[in-house]
Amino acid sequence: MKIHPFTFLYLFLAYWGHSSYYVAFLLFSILHEIGHYLVALYFSFEIEKIMILPFGAFLSLKDLGKHYVYEEIGMLLCGPFINLICFIFFLFIKEPLLAKINIYILIFNLLPVYPLDGSKLLLLFLSYFIDYQKAMQIQIKVSLLFICILWIITKQIGRKIILGYLFYQVILYLKNYRLIYMETLMSDHLSKKRVKINK
């Protein structure tokens, strides 16, 4: 697990400003990624790292896109599922702020914007019907479209910073997606994904 240096700065500022909201948001974001991590371990994904960023956490996998569809769907949905359970729990014990944080993390991660869970689920869905490379191209276009829409309707500077980071990640993905596609083909897992969905 790696922690981005700016994360410590944000935590210090949150402590100095008595912002428990930010600390809770970061903790539940980490819990979200732990959900991904545990399922990734169970299905023997090749885990590269978990990075704790100032505005959340991110699990990096070396072999994402090279497993059976049910394994990847299970891994991708486990993070949002953790937040859904937390949302229901905090509603039940009447902690609306913590419930709000978890439903926000859940909805945000299901947006079809790379590298969020929703974008990867979209890629899995599209790749079952069309060529994988074409699916990746659509994934990138949808990501850029949603970033533009969210940038226009978002007023808060903190959210715009997050959108800027997502835009940067999409551009990196755009530069490398052909290489990722070739690696996926060479791994000989693409045909398994199309055939062995329920096994």
Show which residues each predicted segment covers.
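Hydrophobic transmembrane alpha-helices and their immediate loop junctions
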Residues: 1-199
